[in-house]
UniProtKB/Swiss-Prot annotation:
Role noted for this protein: Core subunit of the mitochondrial membrane respiratory chain NADH dehydrogenase (Complex I) that is believed to belong to the minimal assembly required for catalysis. Complex I functions in the transfer of electrons from NADH to the respiratory chain. The immediate electron acceptor for the enzyme is believed to be ubiquinone.
Cofactor: binding details: Binds 1 [4Fe-4S] cluster.
Name of the gene encoding the protein in the UniProt record: nduf-7
Protein name as it appears in the record: Probable NADH dehydrogenase [ubiquinone] iron-sulfur protein 7, mitochondrial
Key words, A-Z: 4Fe-4S, Electron transport, Iron, Iron-sulfur, Metal-binding, Mitochondrion, NAD, Oxidoreductase, Respiratory chain, Transit peptide, Translocase, Transport, Ubiquinone
Pfam families assigned to the protein according to its UniProt record, in alphabetical order: Oxidored_q6
């Protein structure tokens, strides 16, 4: 028993020593603590500052997502459930906007027809930059039940770029909430300032 404790103590001491050696050999600038972010390149103070700037910008963007509702069919009812008190989208910073010029996210919910496709593209183009799209339901994802109809667009991704697909017919409000949380994770990984610096 005593020898097992000594062996375990020796192993933990070796691990601690190797961790300290790795930390001392890293090329982090003096006075700057590494935080474990995947975008940190400690070779430059400017890159460190831009990584922190990206973190702050991403925190602000993912904490205040303003979606535009583009409800075309029965999936829009589940989008309304998402706004109701049971799921309380406001606690995630999601507030519906009525104008595309004030929105940074669009929920495409329902069947997109060929005649509606130009309007969808026009609305998407009116949104300011840093814009995202959540395609909600099988009809918006790929045509769904009406896939082979002559007047149906087989997925809104043929007209606008889609960031998150929420499956279901219709998807539940929990599924839409999960899609919003996945979008927040995607926003958290953005690194615009660092890419600008490296150009």
């Amino acid at each position: 028993m005593l020898s097992a404790l000594r062996t375990a103590g020796a192993l933990s001491t070796r691990r601690l020593a190797s961790t300290q050696a790795i930390a001392s050999n890293s090329e982090a600038p003096k006075g700057i603590a590494t935080t474990g972010t995947p975008f940190l390149n400690p070779s430059s103070k400017a890159e460190y500052a831009l990584a922190r700037l990206d973190d702050v910008m991403n925190l602000a963007q993912r904490g205040s997502i303003w979606p535009l509702t583009f409800g075309l069919a029965c999936c829009a009812v589940e989008m309304m459930h998402f706004a109701a008190p049971r799921y309380d989208m406001d606690r995630y910073g999601v507030v519906f906007r009525a104008s595309p010029r004030q929105a940074d996210l669009i929920f495409v919910a329902g069947t997109v027809t060929n005649k509606m496709a130009p309007a969808l593209r026009r609305i998407y183009d009116q949104m300011p930059e840093a814009k995202w799209v959540i395609s909600m339901g099988s009809c918006a994802n790929g045509g769904g039940y009406y896939h082979y109809a002559y007047s149906v667009l087989r997925g809104c991704d043929r007209v606008i770029p889609v960031d998150i697909y929420v499956p279901g017919c219709p998807p539940t409000a929990e599924a839409l909430l999960y899609g919003v949380l996945q979008l927040q994770k995607k926003i958290k990984r953005k690194r615009e300032a660092q890419l600008w610096y490296r150009r």
